[in-house]
Amino acid sequence: MAEEQVLNTHNASILLSAANKSHYPQDDLPEIALAGRSNVGKSSFINTILGRKNLARTSSKPGKTQLLNFFNIDDKLRFVDVPGYGYAKVSKSERAKWGKMIEEYLTSRDNLRAVVSLVDLRHAPSKEDIQMYDFLKYYDIPVIVVATKADKIPHGKWNKHESVVKKALNFDKSDTFIVFSSVERIGIDDSWDAILEQV
């Protein structure tokens, strides 16, 4: 997709929710998956870059997303919101089920072009964040790391926090790193540039 202008990002809707590949959309539209731990701000990221308030439901209860949620964007692109990981109150068996569902999608979906891996800029990446990044690198899936909640940190400390995140992830310079805030609307254009470069 050469130009951002050809994509009407406001023309977006939730298409379907799927538990396994038999429920995935059956076409060749490119897909960008969004992964991150519970309450990292995935729903806010989706709503902010699409300019919509409640397209993806934000929840005060972590672990709310239990299926792969496919969002149709102008019939040209899809976002796929995968269940948030690292939520302790979900049973081990439930976490294992989610893990299998996520792994099946990430490793077998031909439509997948890249993964937006969301981390919290305020904190060093969790064990699960690092495992997700390593998993994506192992399978040679392009990664866009989006560090959320930048508005919670003084601007002058962003570089320091970015360095902490990158070091913990063993960040590959061929990937993209974006500082993002849905509150201050920071990183929207950079996110679209990185996404459209992959599709």
Curated annotation (Swiss-Prot):
Chain positions recorded as Mg(2+) binding sites: S43, T65
Any one Gene Ontology BP term: division septum assembly
Gene Ontology cellular-component terms listed: cytosol
Protein residues bound to GTP: 36-43, 63-67, 81-84, 148-151, 180-182
InterPro entries assigned: G_ENGB_dom, GTP-bd, GTP-bd_ribosome_bio_YsxC, P-loop_NTPase, Small_GTP-bd
Pfam family, one: MMR_HSR1
PROSITE patterns per record: G_ENGB
Domain named EngB-type G: residues: 28-199
Gene3D superfamilies, alphabetized: P-loop containing nucleotide triphosphate hydrolases (3.40.50.300)
Single GO molecular function: metal ion binding
Keywords recorded for this protein, A-Z: Cell cycle, Cell division, GTP-binding, Magnesium, Metal-binding, Nucleotide-binding, Septation
Cofactor annotation: Mg(2+)
HAMAP family, per database record: GTPase_EngB
NCBIfam families linked: GTPase_YsxC, small_GTP
Family: Belongs to the TRAFAC class TrmE-Era-EngA-EngB-Septin-like GTPase superfamily. EngB GTPase family.
Function, as annotated: Necessary for normal cell division and for the maintenance of normal septation.
Protein name: Probable GTP-binding protein EngB
Organism: Streptococcus pyogenes serotype M3 (strain ATCC BAA-595 / MGAS315)
